[in-house]
Amino acid sequence: MKGKIQCPALTGMLLAMLIVAVHSASSAEYVPRVEFGARLEPHNRIILGAGQDAASFDSYRRLFDDRHQPLLYMTYVGLCNPVATVVAWGAQVQHELTRLAPYRMVPQIGLNLTGGKDDGSGEDAAIAAGRYDMQIAAFADAVSSFKRPVFLRIGYEFEGSWNNYHPSSFVQAWHRITKVLRDRGLPFASVWCAAGAAAGWLPPEQLMKFYPGDDWVDWWGVDIFSEDEFTRPQLKAFLDAARLHRKPVMIGESTPRYVGVLSGTQSWVRWFAPMLRLLKHCPEIKAICYINWEWKEWSERLGYPWQDWGDARIQCNETVRDRWVKALADPIYLHASGDESVSLPEVQVVGTRR
């Protein structure tokens, strides 16, 4: 066809470069993790998790053998729902955890503080004022019923305009929720999880206005979606700040947005290899959760604008599947296991820290 230049040498060179990039990402060593002594912090390990619904979690975990199951089970609940809805959520999660025995998986809970769907209906001020105390009590009952530790991302993506939280009332709401859970002696670790690039990376001084304080936060967290986020200086600055505050970092949500898995090696080079590089070279990161979704389907189901995010289901591409499963078999990763007891450090419950 006119205007199309055939250049086998160039094509071969580009392919070779891709192969070298993939090999480099997979062969680099993990730097030792920094130890902070936080609640539920593993020693020199990275906890693996997945979600973010029961069927997608099952599809993901079936890719791994019994010794390498994801340890964190992602689940979400809105604190501003009716009490009965919060109770029903707790019962459903308990059912799923029982079904997944003997793996002893640990819930990673996204606790939403809004009254709607990404429409700026933040209820943080009402929570801080005590108007949702019955829901907080019902939520605490649910966490207690799980009889295992949980990670809790209170008001996740707190700086996002779609939530419309206000710094002072968000902090007050965080304190109110955390105090109830701690006073009941529940084995949880709170995760202060930022939206990061999705919210335009607020300047540090603005982001920290949402910070409840070191005594009220156990982990920091950030969500990572698009391929250009891995090398952003703002991400490095966030990780550096977490280290200064002596907090381990959880990647609370991750998915190859706009990349997906269906392009095989290209998908791997664009998103999965950079993610592994980030995990290998950033010793503050001690947990990561992957969203194993076909985003168009869930956009239509739930009514969110995710229709062009792509198919992130690992099982849908052999190249991505095999490389991902192999990469996560590295001993640094902490899995759930069907043939041995895998546990997180004990939580020392000492009441509410002031």
Residue ranges: model-predicted function:
Residues 11-21:
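Bacterial N-terminal signal peptides
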